[in-house]
Amino acid sequence: MKYLYLLSLFILAGGLTSCASFERYRILYNDRIEAGNVEEATRLIENKRFYKKDRNEVLRYLELGALARMQGDLAKSNEYLNKADLLIEDRRASIGSQGLAVVSNPRVLPYRTEYFENIAVHYLKSLNYLQLNDVSAARVEARRTNIRLQELNDAVPEKPLKYHDDVLGHITMGLSYEMNGEWNNAFIAYRNAAELFIQEGKVQPYMGVRIPEQLKCDLVRMADQLGFANDASRYRRLLSPRCKDDVGEGGSLVLFWENGQGPVKEENIIGFDVMRRGDRSQVRFVNNSMGMEYDFGEDIYNEYNGFAGINTVRLALPIFRPREYPLYRADIKYPGGIQRMEMLEDLNVVAEQSLRDRFGRELANALIRLAAKEAVEAGLRSIKTKKKDGDEDNDGDEEQKKSKDEDKDEEEDVEYDETLGLILGTTMSIVNAATERADIRSWQTLPAEIHYQRVPLKRGANEIRVTFYNRYNQRLEEHYLRINGGGRLQVRHVITPDSRVLQPAATQNQKPVQP
């Protein structure tokens, strides 16, 4: 069994550069995005070998989908995101890679999207479809946002997720119903979004975000429009909304602002003490400083021989580090007024909680993987070979046979050489150190924050001005949109990875709006 692992050492060598390649490309890629050079960033993803590898294919499509969105090609964006979605749904790691992961790490496997990345695929597609006036498709994607989260919750019911629902999914669903004139369904969607902020009759933040005033107003407006007097009264009393007229003769505009760049993954090392109960065939991994403890029973104990020879393990895990971004808030000026854009989703908080949720479910397997590698190393170090005696007389064979029975119960003094075990153990130690790296791959082009606001439109041409400020209230950027008010609800977005707006001049391939 020990030598089976040795065979893996040569295979693992090919995977050692994966993480370094990603770190190198990440720097190049982010520099281009921050400079607003989306076309060069796209070419980097399209041409680099790293993104062409099968295990990184889902990342390739996720990045290209987000980049196409930045360039205003929403149909192309959905084409890429659909391909990524299919890979997320259908791809399964090969049996060989699963076996290799026992002595390696997740980087040799096809990239597994984080929980929140699974969800982001759907709400970005939903926002794309809303701008393309494809209401039914937008609604499907919004529903899939919540279906996917429910599936993740149901997968391990004894360990429910704290990131168990997504506000943006309900908001996009409500907008799609509004655009189609389905007021009752829109009310339900807005109510579901608002209820995420209500716990035990009190209003409080959800995933680091306070309930937006606009959501309060949308909920009460829908209740009033449907004649749901009791609901309208309850939510006015509970939420205390401060509402302005947000529907004009020309309809209304809902503007989404995607600000900054999402968090990046980095490596973090956590140590665990290994404790055994041989009489009960139990092994326990303990980190007292973090209050973490994992117990394993007889099956694991016997399979890995109680992880003999190791007393501590150090596990490499990814953590999310938020990135700095210069823009802090934005005001939207429209004919007749001005409104502050409100945060709807903080992806820094969502990403961190999503990772914690996953670790709560998967850390035990990672500990077994690491302990198995170190147990192999300890086993290799124990290998000894019998020393050869160059002066031994071959004619003594007959005498040895003769005394075989006499020496049967006697312990024979034999000298052993530990050199081979030392070499093999050291080799395995080097490989363990090199391969025990956290998987720091992630979807780079997601924003750090998503804000939104609804404003009324007049009939005909509307000039909308969006002014962006830093945290010191200094104006850094202004952007103008020209919207034709035709009496309907319209959705648009602006994107600021850094301090520059990448909003396209026009949305492509829109379906005609039905009267």
Predicted feature descriptions by range:
Residues E79-E89, R143-I147, G181-K202:
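TPR/TPR-like (Sel1-like) alpha-helical repeat modules
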Residues D391-P515:
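C-terminal soluble interaction/assembly domains
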Residues G15-V38:
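Bacterial Sec signal peptide processing site at the extreme N-terminus
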Residues K53-E57, I88-Q98, Q150-E158, A194-S233:
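Boundary/linker segments of alpha-helical solenoid repeat arrays
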Residues V38-E39, L74, V135, W183:
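TPR-repeat structural position
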Residues I27, E63, L67, E117-A120, ...:
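"A position-specific structural signal for the A-helix of alpha-solenoid helical repeats
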